[in-house]
Amino acid sequence: MVLGKVVGTVVASRKEPRIEGLSLLLVRACDPDGTPTGGAVVCADAVGAGVGEVVLYASGSSARQTEVTNNRPVDATIMAIVDLVEMGGDVRFRKD
């Protein structure tokens, strides 16, 4: 899984039928402090995340291992909303 920050939403009025009803969010990989570091990825949202939240997302076949995405054509899925990141005994990120 990868730490990421939700930076936007994606709306598609016409979709492949198997992804109908999925919430799609734009996520950028981030460092343990929550600062975005990478390019944006469109993720299916399995947990109800929102813009500005730090999340864990998985890609590839792991992205299709949730109840929401099972057997659906998705390549990245938000699996968790992060509350706290601790590294070496130091809190690097804490959700407000």
From Swiss-Prot:
Residue ranges of every copy of the BMV domain listed in the record: 1-83
Short name of one Pfam family: EutN_CcmL
Cellular compartment(s): Bacterial microcompartment
Function: Forms vertices in bacterial microcompartment (BMC) shells. Expression of 5 proteins in E.coli (BMC-H (Hoch_5815), BMC-P (Hoch_5814), and 3 BMC-T (Hoch_5812, Hoch_5816, Hoch_3341)) forms 40 nm artificial BMC with a molecular mass of 6.5 MDa. There are 12 BMC-P pentamers per BMC. The shell facets are 20-30 Angstroms thick, with 1 of BMC-T trimers protruding to the exterior.
One Gene Ontology CC term in the entry: bacterial microcompartment
Top-level taxonomic group: Bacteria
Annotated protein name in UniProt: Bacterial microcompartment shell vertex protein
Keywords, alphabetical: Bacterial microcompartment
Note: One of 3 BMC-P proteins in this bacteria, the others are Hoch_4425 and Hoch_4426.
Phenotype of gene-disrupted mutants: Not essential for BMC formation; when an artificial operon without BMC-P proteins (Hoch_5815, Hoch_5812, Hoch_3341, Hoch_5816) is expressed in E.coli BMC shells are made.
Quaternary data: Homopentamer. The base of the pyramid faces outward.
The keyword Translocase appears for this protein: no
Organism in which the protein naturally occurs: Haliangium ochraceum (strain DSM 14365 / JCM 11303 / SMP-2)
UniProt biotechnology annotation: Artificial BMCs can be made in E.coli by expressing (Hoch_5815, Hoch_5812, Hoch_3341, Hoch_5816, Hoch_4425, Hoch_4426, Hoch_5814) or (BMC-H (Hoch_5815), BMC-P (Hoch_5814), and 3 BMC-T (Hoch_5812, Hoch_5816, Hoch_3341)). Cargo proteins can be targeted to this BMC. BMC-H can be modified to place its N- and C-terminii in the interior of the shell (called CPH). Fusing proteins to the C-terminus of CPH allows targeting of cargo proteins to the lumen of the organelle composed of CPH, BMC-P and BMC-T1.
SUPFAM superfamilies per record: EutN/CcmL-like
Coarse class of the protein's main subcellular location: other
CDD domains in UniProt: EutN_CcmL
UniProt KW Metal-binding keyword: no
Assigned protein family: Belongs to the CcmL/EutN family.
